[in-house]
Amino acid sequence: MDIVTDKNIGSNFLADSNNRIYILIGDTDNVIDKYLVSILGKIEFYYVYEITVEDSKLINTFVTSNLLCPIKNKFNIKIYHDYKKVIGSCILNVDGKFTRYKDPSKLHVYVFCYRYNNCLNTCTMVKCHELLYPEKEIIVDGYKINDMSFFYTNPEIIKQHTDIKDYETLYKNIFLRRELNRVILGKPSDLIETLKEIVTINSEDIWKVIVSNDIFDSRDVIKLINFDYDREDFLSFVRAWYSNQLNNCKEDNNKIEKVYEIVRNSI
């Protein structure tokens, strides 16, 4: 998957037979604006969904569209295909406003639909507007944690620290970043399954990650896009490493097992 800074994104976007999916990280509204200007005359309709976390699961909610379905009062490309045949056309939303969303506890999914050779194609933008960082250090088992990627293996730890300002928002932000990390690295992800409820995704789709230039070289971004935080893989490594430390000294082994349990419960 190509990873670029928004500074390197030009003003000419392709609107061809390939469906495209862009993962936007940081304040990247300029990318959305460039896209709209570039293919404005070709867009047949658009819609926006938001993805957030409830009960440790991803949920998606319809936000808006320039078309409204009279039957369901919400819209996506699958509904469009179903009801276009039945009702002839959906209702044009004359509001005319296009909103850029910035809530860090949600991913916002913008789907732009256009026709190419009489086929309907999509350009999907999945935006994580901000990589949150707590105002105070988080202490886990006596250790100061100043790297938010620590929580990618187990975001639930954040919910234990209710003294952190807006800890629920931080928890959701970390949870969503963990899911983005899995998508970027090509790992199985609940986020992919959630996106499939919003837009058609095929193996031939072209993916790209676009990062705001002001955070492109930051530690948070580097770890988000480069490192694997699969919890089971981490547990396997930790188990093997600590097992290799065991010896014939019972006292040493008890210390090793105690530390192992602390680490295992923190992952």
UniProtKB/Swiss-Prot annotation:
<keyword id="KW-0946">Virion</keyword>
<dbReference type="InterPro" id="IPR007660">
    <property type="entry name" value="Poxvirus_D3"/>
</dbReference>
<dbReference type="Pfam" id="PF04580">
    <property type="entry name" value="Pox_D3"/>
</dbReference>
<protein>
    <recommendedName>
        <fullName>27 kDa core protein</fullName>
    </recommendedName>
</protein>
<comment type="function">
    <text>Late protein which is part of a large complex required for early virion morphogenesis. This complex participates in the formation of virosomes and the incorporation of virosomal contents into nascent immature virions.</text>
</comment>
<keyword id="KW-0426">Late protein</keyword>
<comment type="similarity">
    <text>Belongs to the chordopoxvirinae D3 family.</text>
</comment>
<dbReference type="GO" id="GO:0044423">
    <property type="term" value="C:virion component"/>
</dbReference>
